[in-house]
């Protein structure tokens, strides 16, 4: 392995899913993320949102290694968009 091999890095990803409406704190956190993104503090992003209607979800992700995709399944409406510059 190379000295800077990505497989050596420990990464923890936590995904929380809740069916409740977004709270004021949730919205403030999203607004803070947008402010920081406008300042250029992020190099990539991933976003997922569920609409109020059952089985509807929007997922958007961006890294240097992803391409544009838009997919939906027959039973549920899931939309995935992965973008590169």
From Swiss-Prot:
It comes from Bacillus phage SPP1 (Bacteriophage SPP1). To phage SP01 gene 46 protein. This is Uncharacterized 10.2 kDa protein in GP2-GP6 intergenic region.
């Amino acid at each position: 392995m190379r000295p800077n091999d990505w497989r050596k890095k420990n990464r923890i990803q936590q995904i929380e899913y809740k069916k409740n409406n977004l709270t004021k704190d949730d919205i403030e956190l999203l607004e803070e993320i947008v402010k920081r993104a406008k300042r250029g503090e992020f190099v990539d992003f991933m976003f997922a949102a569920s609409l109020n209607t059952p089985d509807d979800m929007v997922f958007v992700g961006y890294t240097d290694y992803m391409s544009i995709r838009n997919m939906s399944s027959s039973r549920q409406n899931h939309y995935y968009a992965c973008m590169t510059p």
